[in-house]
């Protein structure tokens, strides 16, 4: 085996993530925060909200007990979030939701 100094260093594009092996290289909390900002972009618009999203917003703020972390809240409401992004054709948010679902949930 050659010296480690002569081995090719892995670049981010070379690294594949697998949460069943390790969470190294997976930014679940960071991606969840970004995803929450995408959610709020829609549900904070009075034209796009409803009673469920009012409840979700209150829950996210800790209004119904302890404040859950973003990842838990996303995991618990994955289908509703997917439906929201599909309804408003938010492909960027859907792509990140897929990443979070596969890597973190």
Swiss-Prot record:
Disulfide bonds: none annotated. It comes from the Bacteria. Keywords: Nitrogen fixation. GO terms for biological process: nitrogen fixation. The keyword Manganese does not apply. Pfam families: CowN (PF20543). Is required to sustain N(2)-dependent growth in the presence of low levels of carbon monoxide (CO). Probably acts by protecting the N(2) fixation ability of the nitrogenase complex, which is inactivated in the presence of CO. Belongs to the CowN family. This is N(2)-fixation sustaining protein CowN. It comes from Tolumonas auensis (strain DSM 9187 / NBRC 110442 / TA 4). The gene is cowN.
């Amino acid at each position: 085996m050659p010296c480690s100094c002569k081995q090719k260093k892995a670049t981010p594009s070379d690294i594949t993530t697998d949460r069943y092996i390790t969470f190294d290289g997976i930014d679940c909390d960071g991606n969840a925060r970004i995803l929450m900002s995408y959610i709020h972009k829609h549900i904070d618009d009075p034209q796009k909200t409803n009673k469920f999203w009012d409840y979700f917003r209150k829950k996210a703020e800790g209004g119904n007990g302890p404040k859950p972390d973003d990842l838990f809240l996303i995991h618990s409401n994955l289908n509703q979030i997917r439906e929201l992004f599909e309804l408003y054709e938010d492909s960027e948010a859907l792509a990140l939701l897929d990443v979070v679902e596969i890597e973190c949930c």
